[in-house]
Amino acid sequence: MSTLARLSLESQGDVELAKVAGEVDASNVADLSQRLLAAVSNKARALVLDLSETSYIDSSGIGLIFDAAARLRNRRQELRLVVTPRSFVGEVLAAVSMERSVPIDAQLDEALRAVDDSG
C-alpha cells in the first residue's frame, strides 16, 4: 500500500473495526481492499469502516466500499461506515448515494451501537 492511506484494525467482540486515515485512491485501493477483507473473520457479525480520518477518496475507493459491502452481504455480514458529515469524503459518498447501499454514521459509537442493535 502506498503511504497515502494508513489502515489500523481492531476487534471489538464480534465486530471488526477498520480505521483508514489519509488518502484512498487507485494507487493503494487494491492492497487496502485485500487487507480489509482478510481482516474480517467468518465469525464477525460486522465490519465498521471508519473513514473519519480519510481526507480523500476517488472512484476506486468508492468501488472498494461497494465491493466490500457486496462481499460481506454474501457472507451474511454487515458493513457500516463512519464518515464526518460535510467532509470531502462525506460529500463524495452523498453524491453517489452511498447511504442507499451502506449505512453511514457520523460517529464511531453510533455505528457500534447500531451493530449491537441489529444483532
Predicted regions and their residues:
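Actinobacteria-biased recognition of intrinsically disordered, low-complexity terminal regions
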Residues: M1-T3, S118-G119
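STAS-typified acidic loop motif
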Residues: T3-Q34, E53
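Residues that form or immediately flank small-molecule/cofactor binding pockets and catalytic motifs
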Residues: D14, R86, D109
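Amphipathic alpha-helical interaction surfaces in cytosolic regulatory modules
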Residues: A26-V102
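Acidic phosphotransfer microenvironment of two-component signaling modules
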Residues: A30, D109-E110
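Short acidic-hydrophobic, aromatic-tinged amphipathic segments that line or gate anion-handling sites
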Residues: S101-D109
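Generic C-terminal helix-cap and adjacent flexible tail
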Residues: E110-G119
